[in-house]
Amino acid sequence: MAQGSDNNDTSYTKSPSPGNKQGSSDDMRKVMRREKNRIAAQKSRMRQTQKADSLHLESESLEKENAALRKEVKRLTEEAKYLSTVLSNHEPLCTGLSGASPELLYGAHHGAFHQHISVPHYPL
């Protein structure tokens, strides 16, 4: 890039003639406007960086929560399979109750063929 072609370079601005108060006032306004714009741009970049940092932290938190929920789904799926197996193994022992209502099948029954089965507790 050629030297002096930068629009923000103030060394190439025209200096007003000593008697021209209007030109001096315009230059001051231009300098003030540029300074305000520079500060506003800096604040905008800071807000953008803070927002990106915040979104990054939220993303990490959601990924951890997602992993915990997937772990819980896996545990509950394994528990459901286990309980299904326990039920399948227990149903043949309840031969006198075939065709009975669900309350009798799955309620507390104390028949001669009832087998007590301990259910494992999975850690969270």
From Swiss-Prot:
GO biological-process terms attached to the record: defense response to protozoan; DNA damage response; DNA damage response, signal transduction by p53 class mediator; hematopoietic stem cell differentiation; isotype switching; lymphoid progenitor cell differentiation; myeloid dendritic cell differentiation; positive regulation of cytokine production
Domain bZIP: 27-90
Region of interest called Basic motif, as start-end residue ranges on this chain: 29-51
A Pfam family per the record: bZIP_1
InterPro entries linked to this entry: AP-1 (IPR000837), bZIP (IPR004827), bZIP_sf (IPR046347)
Region Disordered, residue ranges: 1-60
Function of the protein: AP-1 family transcription factor that controls the differentiation of lineage-specific cells in the immune system: specifically mediates the differentiation of T-helper 17 cells (Th17), follicular T-helper cells (TfH), CD8(+) dendritic cells and class-switch recombination (CSR) in B-cells.
Name assigned to this protein: Basic leucine zipper transcriptional factor ATF-like
